[in-house]
Amino acid sequence: MNPSELVREFHRVYDMPVYDSPHRPSSERVKLRVGLILEEFCELLSGVYDNGSKTWTSIYSTTIKNALPPSKDPEGYNEVEVADALADLVYVIYGMALELGIPLDDVLEEVHRSNLSKLGEDGKPIYREDGKVMKGPNFFEPNIRKVLRDHHKPGSF
């Protein structure tokens, strides 16, 4: 499956919104999505600059998350700018993966496999109060190290 199909499957399994034409989401969904992007960006910073120490993730939790605008209709919402920024983010992220030799599509498949293990004991999604999917009792971490090892070429380091 391509990345879009993986995410679509996740949304279907966890009963999250999917629209096939431009749609203005609720302020709560915008805040959740922007927060998730910032949270993952902070994880990237921790991995690049702090050997994965979670320093940036901690900064996100204590500072950046609280700086997001309150849940109200974003008056300045511009779907063209949002679409452009999302495309640019994906483009730049794939570019970074290429420069680092990271097989991003394979890593995404492994993360997707892990994400599908978040269901609760009853087979239903578990949500945080803001709508974020939480890890259930059968959750397992993605084995990204194995994916990278499987793609490692001897002598490349």
Q: PLM ranges: what are they?
A:
Residues 1-86, 90-157:
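Flexible "arm" and connector segments at domain edges
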